[in-house]
Design a protein with these regions (language model features):
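Active-site neighborhoods and metal-handling regions in enzymes and metal-associated proteins
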Residues: 1-168
Length: 168
């Protein structure tokens, strides 16, 4: 199951995050960005899942252009409401198994992190000019917004209380 990570926890809408990614793409002269890092995809789209035990991650890939966005995931794991919400925001949901065929047909200047892209997908992009760089989402994820900072503080307080009760 894939579910929405509420804005009251993330502090930023997907549209805003995508706009920041697209700005970074423009800086690097890329007109597409291939994202295969599961934590980055979960963060970018404010989604969580249970495909991988003991993590909030789900199997997925993302292809982002200046004006379009494609999210590849198991369609049977996302609700009709979430599917419609993404459609309204210009995000196309495609089946996880379609990513290879999709990549084979691309001719863009693509930003990707070769350390996080598997060999098959990297080679399928042979028609593309590839810009190898870190995922812009890595740094964006690391810089916390005010809501995230408030939640981190609350977690540390609760953790401190639990440790104190445990020790005494």
């Amino acid at each position: 199951t894939i579910y929405r990570h509420d804005i009251k926890y993330s502090g930023e809408h997907t549209d805003s995050k995508l706009a920041r990614v697209r700005e970074k793409m423009k800086e690097l002269d890329a007109n597409a960005f291939f994202l295969s890092s599961l934590p980055d995809i979960a963060w970018l789209f404010n989604l969580r899942g249970d495909d991988i035990a003991c993590t909030p991650l789900f199997y997925s890939y993302a292809w982002i252009t200046i004006d379009k966005c494609f999210l590849f995931l198991r369609k049977d794991c996302i609700s009709a409401v979430a599917f419609q919400r993404f459609k309204e925001h210009g995000i196309s949901i495609l089946d996880y198994t379609e990513v290879s065929a999709f990549l084979k047909d691309q001719h863009e200047t693509v930003l990707l992190n070769p350390d996080l892209t598997n060999y098959l997908h990297y080679n399928l992009l042979f028609k593309c000019k590839i810009i190898e760089d870190k995922n812009p989402t890595e740094l964006m994820k690391a810089i916390k917004n005010d809501i995230q900072i408030d939640h981190l503080k609350a977690c540390h307080i609760n953790d401190g209380i639990a440790m104190t009760k445990f020790m005494y």
